[in-house]
C-alpha cells in the first residue's frame, strides 16, 4: 500500500476489517438501477436510463464493482485504479452518486458487506454541490469537509454560505463523505479513511471515487536566484536558520555553471547518504513549522523546502533551460489503493495509462462531435509565450489580436468562453479594460457572469491551469483556445519519475543525458498534458451535452495552435468534428501548408499530384513539383491529419497515378 500524505502510518493503529464478502453483483445492480431512477428526474435535460448515457452508467457500475472486489481481497487486493474516461458532460458524476447510494443501501442490508464511501473532488465549490445533491438523496448519511466547511472557518471565499459544517473527526460517523484532493492527500488525510460501523472503528472505507485526475506528483521547481532570494527573506525573519540554509545553497551552487548542459544530481557527486545527512533538518517537524509560519509572506518558500526534502530522498535533479539552470524535485502522491475508481474524461489521452500499469480502463461509449465546428486560426507569434508575454507591449499586442479574433468568429448576442495564458490575468490584460479599471476587483463578473462585453458579445475568461471539470460555462456558444498549455520537459521528466515512484538515478531519467534526450515516457506525458488541457477546455461550452446517441451539443471551437500537431491529433480529440482553417498562415511548414490547402471546401473530391503542385505554387509563388514534397510530408502523422480533415492519399503507378481523394467521414464546413 502506498503512503498517502502520511495517512498509511496512522492507519496502522486502526482496526483493519477481516476479509469481507464481495457484494452480490445482481443485487447491487438492482439497487444501482433504482438509484438512477431516483436521480433521473433531477436531470431534466438528459435521460440517464437510455442510450449513450445508460452505457456510461454501465461503465461506472463495472468500475465500481471491480474496485469493491479488489477491496474485499484485503492486503492481497490488486494495486490498481479503475478508470472511467467517458466524455465530459456524459453523466459520470450522476452515476457515481447512484453507485454510492446503492452501495450504502446494500451495506445496510448485509452486515458482512464492505462499508463506507469517500467522494474526492478537486474544488471546494464542487464539494458543496455534491453534498447538496447526495444529502437530498440519502439524508443524514452524508458529510463534507473542506477548509470552508469546517465548523471553525472564519473566512469563506469559495462558498460564503456552505450547505453544511463538520469537523474532520465527525466524518467517521457517516457512510458517505465528500472531501477534496488536497485534504485526502494531505497530512490529516487519514481521517477520510476512518469509518465507524456498529460502534466499531475501522481503518478503511471500501469505495473511493476520485472525480477528475488528482495531483499525483507534486513538483518543486525553482532557480538558484529564486532560492537565494527566498533564503535572504527567511534569514531576515529567522537568522538562526542560516546554517541549514547554507548547507542547501552549497549543494545547489555547483550546478549553476552547467557547462555540459546535461542532467546532474547532487547524489552523483556527493553520495546520497551525505546529501540526506546535510539536509535532514528539512524533513523535521521544526521545518514544517517554519514553512507554516512564513509561507504566506515569502513567495515560493514551499518550493524551496519541498526541493530540499526531495533531495534527501534522491528525487531531484538540475538541468539547464536556456541560460538558466532549473532545480526540480518531486514527491509521489498516488491515489492507488484497492477499492478506488477515477472519473476523468481525458484519462485516455494524458499519457499516464501508457506508462503506469496500475491504471485499468473500463469500456466506455464513444462520443460523436458532429455538432462541433472547429476553426483553426494562425498563432499571433511563434515565439515562446512564457518569454514573449513578459513585455507589456507584447501583452497589449497579443490581447489586441485576441479581441480581433473574437470579433471575427463570434456574433453579437452570443456567449463565449476565452481560455488563455495566466500571465495575461496576472497583468490585468484580460479583459482588455483600461489599467486600474474597478471591474477587475470583481473577478466573478468576467469569469462567471459573462460581463466582459465586446460590442455585444458576452464573454467569460479563464486561464490554463484551472477550469477542468467546471460546469460554469456550459451555456457558451463558442470557446476560444488561445495557444496551448505546454509542460516544460524537465517537469515532464520529473512527473514520469514520480508516477513510477523512481529516484533520479532510476528509470527513464537515468538514461537521459539532457532533458532533450529521447525518452518515450517523457514524450507521452508531455504530449498527454497538452492534449488533455486542449480537450478539457474546448468542451466547457454547449459541446459538453449529448443526446441519446452520444452526439454533442452545437458549439464552435476557435483554436490557435501549431497547425500540423493539432490536425494530427484532432481525430483523437474530437471524432467526426467539422474542421476548417481561417486566416493567413505565414512561415508555415509544407505539411501545414498542405493541410491549409486541403481545408478549402471548394476543392474537387479528387486532386492529382500535379494539381496539388499547382495549388502549392499558387500559395507560395514558387514552382514546387510534388516529388520534392512527398518524401518529407508522407508520414504517419500527416496521414492522421488528412483523416481528420476528410482526405486520404492514394498511391498509384505512373505519372498522375497518385492522388488525394475526399473521404465521407468529415464534412468540411465553408467559411
List PLM regions with ranges.
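ASCE RecA-like P-loop NTPase motor cores
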Residues: 3-671
Amino acid at each position: 500500500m502506498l503512503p498517502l500524505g502520511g495517512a498509511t502510518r496512522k492507519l496502522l493503529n486502526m482496526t483493519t476489517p477481516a476479509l469481507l464478502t464481495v457484494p452480490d453483483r445482481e443485487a447491487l445492480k438492482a439497487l444501482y438501477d433504482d438509484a438512477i431512477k431516483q436521480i433521473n428526474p433531477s436531470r431534466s435535460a438528459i435521460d440517464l436510463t437510455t442510450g449513450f448515457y445508460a452505457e456510461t452508467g454501465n461503465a461506472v457500475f463495472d468500475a465500481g464493482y471491480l474496485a469493491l472486489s479488489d477491496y474485499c481481497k484485503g492486503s492481497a487486493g490488486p494495486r490498481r485504479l479503475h478508470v472511467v474516461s467517458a466524455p465530459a458532460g456524459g453523466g459520470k458524476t450522476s452515476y457515481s452518486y447512484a453507485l454510492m447510494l446503492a452501495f450504502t443501501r446494500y451495506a445496510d442490508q448485509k452486515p458482512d458487506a464492505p462499508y463506507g464511501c469517500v467522494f474526492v473532488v478537486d474544488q471546494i465549490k464542487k464539494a458543496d454541490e455534491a453534498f447538496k445533491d447526495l444529502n437530498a438523496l440519502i439524508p443524514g448519511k452524508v458529510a463534507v469537509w473542506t477548509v470552508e466547511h469546517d465548523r471553525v472557518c472564519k473566512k469563506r471565499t469559495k462558498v460564503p454560505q456552505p450547505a453544511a459544517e463538520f469537523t474532520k473527526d465527525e466524518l467517521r460517523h457517516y457512510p458517505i463523505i465528500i472531501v477534496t484532493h488536497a485534504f485526502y492527500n494531505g497530512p490529516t488525510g487519514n481521517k477520510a479513511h476512518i469509518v465507524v460501523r456498529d460502534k466499531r472503528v475501522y481503518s478503511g472505507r471500501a469505495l473511493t471515487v476520485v472525480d477528475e485526475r488528482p495531483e499525483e506528483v507534486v513538483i518543486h521547481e525553482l532557480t538558484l536566484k529564486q532560492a537565494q532570494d527566498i533564503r535572504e527573506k527567511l534569514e531576515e525573519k529567522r537568522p538562526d536558520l542560516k546554517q541549514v540554509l547554507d548547507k542547501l545553497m552549497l549543494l545547489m551552487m555547483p550546478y549553476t555553471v552547467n557547462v555540459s548542459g546535461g542532467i546532474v544530481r547532487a547524489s552523483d557527486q556527493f553520495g546520497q547518504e551525505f546529501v540526506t545527512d546535510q539536509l535532514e533538518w528539512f524533513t523535521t517537524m521544526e521545518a514544517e513549522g517554519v514553512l507554516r509560519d512564513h509561507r504566506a509572506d515569502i513567495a515560493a518558500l514551499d518550493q524551496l523546502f519541498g526541493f530540499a526534502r526531495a533531495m534527501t530522498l534522491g528525487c531531484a535533479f538540475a538541468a539547464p533551460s536556456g541560460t538558466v539552470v532549473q532545480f526540480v524535485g518531486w514527491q509521489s502522491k498516488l491515489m492507488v489503493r484497492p477499492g478506488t475508481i477515477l472519473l476523468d474524461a481525458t484519462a485516455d489521452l494524458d499519457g499516464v495509462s501508457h506508462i503506469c500499469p496500475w491504471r485499468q480502463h473500463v469500456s466506455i461509449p464513444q462520443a460523436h462531435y458532429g455538432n462541433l465546428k472547429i476553426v483553426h486560426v494562425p498563432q499571433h507569434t511563434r515565439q515562446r509565450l512564457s518569454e514573449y508575454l513578459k513585455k507589456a507591449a507584447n501583452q497589449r499586442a497579443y490581447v489586441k489580436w485576441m479581441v480581433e479574433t473574437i470579433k471575427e468568429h463570434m456574433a453579437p448576442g452570443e456567449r463565449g468562453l476565452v481560455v488563455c495564458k495566466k500571465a495575461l490575468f496576472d497583468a490585468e490584460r484580460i479583459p482588455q479594460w483600461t489599467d486600474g479599471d474597478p471591474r477587475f476587483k470583481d473577478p466573478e463578473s468576467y469569469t462567471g457572469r459573462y460581463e466582459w462585453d465586446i460590442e455585444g458579445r458576452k464573454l467569460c475568461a479563464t486561464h490554463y491551469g484551472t477550469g477542468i471539470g467546471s460546469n460554469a460555462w456550459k451555456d457558451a456558444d463558442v470557446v476560444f483556445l488561445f495557444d496551448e498549455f505546454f509542460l516544460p520537459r524537465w517537469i515532464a521528466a520529473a512527473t514520469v519519475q514520480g508516477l513510477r515512484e523512481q529516484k533520479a538515478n532510476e528509470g527513464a531519467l537515468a538514461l537521459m543525458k539532457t532533458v532533450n534526450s529521447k525518452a518515450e515516457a517523457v514524450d507521452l506525458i508531455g504530449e498527454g498534458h497538452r492534449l488533455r488541457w486542449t480537450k478539457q477546455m474546448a468542451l466547457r461550452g454547449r459541446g459538453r451535452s449529448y443526446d441519446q446517441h452520444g452526439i454533442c451539443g452545437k458549439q464552435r471551437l476557435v483554436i490557435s495552435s501549431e497547425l500540423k500537431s493539432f490536425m494530427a491529433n484532432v481525430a483523437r480529440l474530437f471524432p467526426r468534428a467539422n474542421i476548417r482553417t481561417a486566416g493567413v498562415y505565414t512561415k508555415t511548414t509544407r505539411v501545414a501548408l498542405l493541410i491549409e490547402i486541403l481545408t478549402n471546401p471548394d476543392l474537387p473530391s479528387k486532386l492529382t499530384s500535379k494539381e496539388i503542385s499547382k495549388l502549392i505554387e499558387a500559395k507560395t509563388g514558387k514552382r514546387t513539383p510534388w516529388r520534392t514534397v512527398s518524401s518529407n510530408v508522407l508520414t504517419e502523422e500527416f496521414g492522421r491529419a488528412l483523416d481528420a480533415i476528410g482526405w486520404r492519399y492514394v498511391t498509384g503507378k505512373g505519372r498522375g497515378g497518385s492522388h488525394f481523394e475526399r473521404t465521407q467521414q468529415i464534412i468540411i464546413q465553408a467559411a
